[in-house]
Amino acid sequence: GILFMFAASLTFSLMNACVKLLDSMSSMELIFFRHVFTAICIGIWWCFYPPYKTDSKPRKKGGYLRLLMRSLTGGLAMLAMFYNIATISLGTASAFAQTMPIYIVLFTLLFTKERVRLPIILATMIGFVGVICICDIRTESLGIDNIIAGIINGIMMALAYMSLKDLKEYFNESSMIMGFAITMAVVGGVFMFIEIPPLSGFSMPNVREWIGILILGILGTLGQMFLTRAFILAPAGLISPLDYMRIVWGVIFGVMLGDSLPNMMTLSGITLIIVSGVLIAMPVFLQDYKKYKNKSLKP
């Protein structure tokens, strides 16, 4: 499970690097082609393994409006992330994307009756300090638009993640991925022809861009497969902290593609976000580790 989570983190980071290389294409174009490829892959998978045959768990009827809302929030998160990847350093864009746990804790405090312990609240405050650090507008490449996109990215990813718990009662995983892919392919296909600078716009891809689109689709699909496999093989709390490797990979691949090294303020912010995320995940990590250890010791 840990190896698959590591592979998922690396694969998604490579996908983000591919997005940066395709900065000549609009974010809407990338969303359209990325999700058309995913829908085709899931469709081929369903030809061999139909969901009604492989899913033995009883499901509730309906849930389509919830699936649509989850798809739209996840799509907005991806749109904001793609925009930042194209316009700022890959490491900073990756750090914004990994602020999701901070907003989950905040929404849990504000909108649910779940009890949040003081250490988690303190970890969340550390994360917000990290966000403030990477929102340093004194850096030449980071503008107000990037800060807004980064905040939207984290908030929308948190909302999309929190909706998964309810959606599992209605759909299996492949159906949720297909619903998300179809929704975002339609949204991307429509809005790339509507003038919304700098997000929209369409130009026929050249040979290099078609190759990039193909690699983007393959990496995205592989990343989703590795991530799913990781959560099947190991408890979520045990492997979730490894997802923060995406920030490290983002900095490495960004520098390889020409980004400058993060300044001290940005590096401090990235470090605080990683520390915050690991601290937020720590109680679940320890709980799952004990269960996993006890299970492995049983004869």
Give the positions of each predicted feature.
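Loop-to-transmembrane-helix transition segments
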Residues: 1-7, 53-80, 145-153, 202-222
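Membrane-interface helix termini and inter-helical loops of multi-pass transporters
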Residues: 17-27, 54-56, 132-143, 194-212, ...
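Transmembrane alpha-helices of multi-pass small-molecule transport proteins
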Residues: 26-76, 156-160, 179-196, 275
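Hydrophobic transmembrane alpha-helices of multi-pass small-molecule transport proteins
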Residues: 119-136, 265-284
